[in-house]
Amino acid sequence: MARSIKKGPFVDDHLMKKVEAQDGSEKKQVIKTWSRRSTIFPNFIGHTFAVYDGRKHVPVYVTEDMVGHKLGEFAPTRTFKGHAADDKKTRR
């Protein structure tokens, strides 16, 4: 279910402050965050976020196509190892 339009998009305040602080400086560093729920704003473009996936921080470089999505969409939490191999082929 989508968020109500009257509420507007959500972004954590501490994350927005970190982005605004880096916009003023020349050197851009990786911004480490646990806020997977934050919406990507247009002023995030060009920044790299280290988004926590429950195990480690995954680097996510924000491009123009990502605006409006959540940070957590680009850091998957589950790793799929594949289904078990079929033993019928090895028995022949």
Curated annotation (Swiss-Prot):
GO cellular component term, pick one: small ribosomal subunit
GO biological process, alphabetically ordered: ribosomal small subunit assembly; translation
PANTHER family in alphabetical order: RIBOSOMAL PROTEIN S19P FAMILY MEMBER, SMALL RIBOSOMAL SUBUNIT PROTEIN US19M
Listed HAMAP family: Ribosomal_uS19
Record function comment: Protein S19 forms a complex with S13 that binds strongly to the 16S ribosomal RNA.
Entries under Gene3D superfamilies matching the protein: 30s Ribosomal Protein S19, Chain A
Pfam families, alphabetized: Ribosomal_S19
GO molecular function: rRNA binding; structural constituent of ribosome
Organism lineage: Bacteria, Bacillati, Bacillota, Bacilli, Bacillales
GN (gene name): rpsS
Protein name per its UniProtKB record: Small ribosomal subunit protein uS19
PROSITE patterns: RIBOSOMAL_S19
Keywords: Ribonucleoprotein, Ribosomal protein, RNA-binding, rRNA-binding
InterPro entries, per the entry: Ribosomal_uS19, Ribosomal_uS19_bac-type, Ribosomal_uS19_CS, Ribosomal_uS19_SF
Family that this chain belongs to: Belongs to the universal ribosomal protein uS19 family.
Domain of life where this protein originates: Bacteria
